[in-house]
Structure formats: structure tokens, C-alpha cells
Amino acid sequence: MKKIQLNSIASSCSLSGQRLDLVLSKLFREYSRSYLKKLIIMNQVLVNESIVNQPDKKILGGETLTIHPFSKDLLVDIPENIFLDIVYEDSDILIINKPAGLVVHPGSGNKSGTILNALLYHYKNSKDLPRAGIVHRLDKDTSGLMVIAKNIFSYNHLLLLLKEKKIIREYEGIVHGKMIAGGTINKPIMRHYNRRTCMMVHHLGKPSVTHYKVLSRFKFHTHIAIRLETGRTHQIRVHMLHIKYPLVGDPCYSGFKIQSNYRKDKKTNKIYKFPRQALHANHLSLHHPIKKNVMSWTVPLPQDIQELLLKI
């Protein structure tokens, strides 16, 4: 991409505590907030000469903010004919079953081949909606249910339901270790200091609550059900590591001490090398934006996790 120019400006202390994308829209008024948000996501914004790719990062005030603008037509998301596994659809919402390996929306390293690109292809009106109607995300290698808005009324309604914690999102996962019982994890989460693609539990983070219960126990593993009360980035994965029961196959959050006899067992050693986090969003429940009735959807575990359960 050809850069147009380089712009730097010092932020005022009066902007302390405000979101980065909002601050940029106030300082660089020639650009829209949505355009600036895309620049942030694409690693084209520096805060004190360090790349920041979080639009919601809070500004302290006094930092030097630098943007690398691109021609706006180069930032347009392209419609792509990507298959969507549709579980339910009406004129207001779409429920899909996302496979592992599919990214939700374009970002650094994933400029195309995402659910957003697929929505732009299959639903022409989605181009007029924020993020093509996407109101929540699943990690690339987490499979399962997502709700997507098909009009602006539904989009705003679903965002409100999420804010009020009125969308029930339940998961199944397989963790390392033999759990005794279920419980609730109430620990704040923030971005990791050094590993910028990972998150961590920290007292300065955002409030995060995860409920879990045991479905079945095995020699070295536990099959669990999880319900989110909040929806932070990597929340389940971070919380499971925090209580020392990390998800099988998690590339970012499996750094823990394994029982001495664990890797000596050939079967469990293969399980340790499962190619993605063993996590699936199996259940979704919400009040329909227009019909107002409660609707629920449940999908089975994907084949790879079903086979994993047979191995443990």
C-alpha cells in the first residue's frame, strides 16, 4: 500500500481516560472515526512510537500519537464468496456456526478471508452496517455459534443486550488436569505486558466473570461446560490458565507445569499437541430484536473435539 503522509500530534491531558479511536477522531478531524479505527486495527497508529492495535485503549494524556494514513479506497473490505454454515436466519438476525480457523473480521495479518468478507458477499446490505452486522467475536481457532445483525435496529438492539449481559453464551471445552468441581472465576483481564497478542489476569484489567461446571472427568483431563457473564478477549482461555486448568491445544495459554507422568503416556502426549484450543461455542440464547421472544440455538461439538474426547 502506498502511504499518503505521516501525521503526528501530542495529545492533551484533557483527553486522559478516553479511547484511542475517539481521541484520534478529535485530533485528526479530516478523517472519520471508522477510518481511524481501521488504521489502528491494521497497526498503522503509534503511541509514543509503539504500535497500538486496540481502538479502545485508554489514553493517559500527553502522548505523541502518530498515524500512517492510506488511501481510503485501499481500506475498503472486499466481498468474498466464503461458505457460511447458517443455523438460523430471518430478516433481522443471522445465526452461524463458525468453523475453527476462520477469522471473524479483517485485521493485522488477516486482510481477507474472514466472516466479514463473507457477509459482504452474501448480504449486500451488510455494507451499510458497522462491521457488516458483527456484534461479537470468536477467536480464530474457537468454533461455534455467533449472532449477526441484518439491519441497524437489530445491530443496536443486540449491542444493548450484550452490554446488559442478556445474551447467554455457553461453551464446551477440554482442559488439562482433573477438576474436582465447577465454580466461578471473577478476575479482571488486560493485555499482556510483553506478549501483545495475549491477555492476562491483572488487577488493572477489565472486570471479567466466567462460570464453569464439570461434564466428565478423565485420567489427565476434564470436559467442562462454560458460561460467559462478560465477553473479554480470550476470556475463557485466560481464566482457565489462571486456575491452572488450561485448554487443551491452546497456543497462547498452555504454559504450565505438567504432571511428571503426563508426557510419558503416549496417548496423552498426542492430546497435548492438539492443533487448536479445544473450545466450542455450543449454545446461544437471546431475545429476538423484533419478535421479542426468547430464542435459543444449540449445535453439537465439531468432529475434531468429538474425536479428542474419544482419545482421552
Curated annotation (Swiss-Prot):
Keyword Oxidoreductase: no
UniProt xrefs under SUPFAM superfamilies: Alpha-L RNA-binding motif, Pseudouridine synthase
Reaction it catalyzes: uridine(1911/1915/1917) in 23S rRNA = pseudouridine(1911/1915/1917) in 23S rRNA
GO cellular component: cytoplasm
Domain of life of the source: Bacteria
Domain S4 RNA-binding, residue spans: 18-87
Broad class of enzyme this protein falls into: isomerase
GO MF annotations, alphabetized: 23S rRNA pseudouridine(1911/1915/1917) synthase activity; RNA binding
EC number(s) given by UniProt: 5.4.99.23
Entries under InterPro entries matching the protein: PsdUridine_synth_cat_dom_sf (IPR020103), PsdUridine_synth_RluA-like_CS (IPR006224), PsdUridine_synth_RluC/D (IPR006225), PsdUridine_synth_RsuA/RluA (IPR006145), RluA_PseudoU_synthase (IPR050188), S4_RNA-bd (IPR002942), S4_RNA-bd_sf (IPR036986)
Protein's cellular compartments: Cytoplasm
Pfam family, one: PseudoU_synth_2
Predominant cellular place of this UniProt entry's protein: cytoplasm
Keywords, sorted A to Z: Cytoplasm, Isomerase, RNA-binding, rRNA processing
Catalytic site: D139
GO BP annotations listed: enzyme-directed rRNA pseudouridine synthesis
Gene3D superfamilies linked to this entry: Pseudouridine synthase, RNA-binding S4 domain
Family membership noted in the UniProt record: Belongs to the pseudouridine synthase RluA family.
Main function: Responsible for synthesis of pseudouridine from uracil at positions 1911, 1915 and 1917 in 23S ribosomal RNA.
Name under which the protein is recorded: Ribosomal large subunit pseudouridine synthase D
